[in-house]
Amino acid sequence: MARIAGVDIPREKRIVISLTYVYGIGTSTAKKIVEEANVSADTRVKDLTDDELGRIREVVDSYKVEGDLRREQNLNIKRLMEISSYRGIRHRRGLPVRGQKTKNNARTRKGPVKTVANKKK
């Protein structure tokens, strides 16, 4: 397995597909990276030369991926919570951030249903 940005990418797949195993690289970014590195998109990872892998690593290093990207996202969310913006408050309370309704659904953010006992007659 070849290592790119600290991630073992699969050898049997095409390089464009293998690059998407790195956090922060999707299909369109992977195509741009391969194009910048002057490598054929149809090449399998096992068929790449060391020179081609080196060029791909150099291009990937110019992108923010893996730990750096995760750290930046966490810092952005913490900043929103510290300045007590509306989005930060929603993050703090574990509610949907982007304006979704919460009367019925939003179970992914709110967690399992907490049933409330009915008042007896």
From Swiss-Prot:
Under Pfam families, the record lists: Ribosomal_S13
Region described as Disordered:
91-121
* UniProt keyword rRNA-binding, yes or no: yes
PROSITE patterns named in the record: RIBOSOMAL_S13_1, RIBOSOMAL_S13_2
Annotated keywords: Ribonucleoprotein, Ribosomal protein, RNA-binding, rRNA-binding, tRNA-binding
Keyword Transcription among UniProt keywords: no
Q: Which GO terms describe its cellular component?
A: cytosol; small ribosomal subunit
Q: Alphabetically, which GO biological process terms does the record hold?
A: translation
Concerning InterPro entries, the annotation shows: Rbsml_uS13_C, Ribosomal_uS13, Ribosomal_uS13-like_H2TH, Ribosomal_uS13_bac-type, Ribosomal_uS13_CS
Q: What does this protein do?
A: Located at the top of the head of the 30S subunit, it contacts several helices of the 16S rRNA. In the 70S ribosome it contacts the 23S rRNA (bridge B1a) and protein L5 of the 50S subunit (bridge B1b), connecting the 2 subunits; these bridges are implicated in subunit movement. Contacts the tRNAs in the A and P-sites.
Under HAMAP family, the record lists: Ribosomal_uS13
Subunit info here reads:
Part of the 30S ribosomal subunit. Forms a loose heterodimer with protein S19. Forms two bridges to the 50S subunit in the 70S ribosome.
In Swiss-Prot or TrEMBL terms, this protein is called Small ribosomal subunit protein uS13
The gene it comes from is rpsM
